Amino acid sequence: MRETEVTRKTNETDITLRLGLPDLTRDGVVGIIDETARVMEIYTGVPFFDHMLHAMFFHGGFSVDLRAVGDVEIDDHHTVEDVGIVIGTALREAVELHGPVRRFGHSVVPMDDALGEVVVDAGGRSYLVYQATYPQDRAGRFDLSLVREFFQGLSSQGRINMHVLGRYGDNGHHLAEALFKAAGRALGSAFLPRETVASTKGVL
């Protein structure tokens, strides 16, 4: 398994992540070849965010052990943003450690009334396009405006061009979940291994 570990500690958050990148399994599915080695442990202190991250990593075929302690007694913002930063850092470092990836990924995912679409280019250029209008401000106690902050942190530190598009939805929870699942599937495809660099320049 292509793995990387990242630790980030600030005055606001303390985060550790061990991330395993997906491969193509024997039956052509994006995932961990040795399923017994796959870990799905996520704890950020923000339950709804944990749920979204689990959906993202599960459907992307990743293995993940993520632990975050943040100042959630003040606000969830620092934890959500910093987790995005750490995940982006791990993805970037995984490429540096383990070699070229396929680079591009695209996924459209429905969740009942909602439809989410995510397109990624892991080509070394950070840029986020985020278009999502939530019919409610919150999903339970979670501020849905923080979804953008998460993807901004992931995109910037991962040096990934991401287009995160909430096409429509009547339920904020469903729309956010569709976006996280689509992001996982798009990232899983983009970070599959390949033998040569996916660029006419020869480098990323």
Regions found by a protein language model. Give the residues of each.
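N-terminal intrinsically disordered, cationic/polar leader segments
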Residues: 1-204
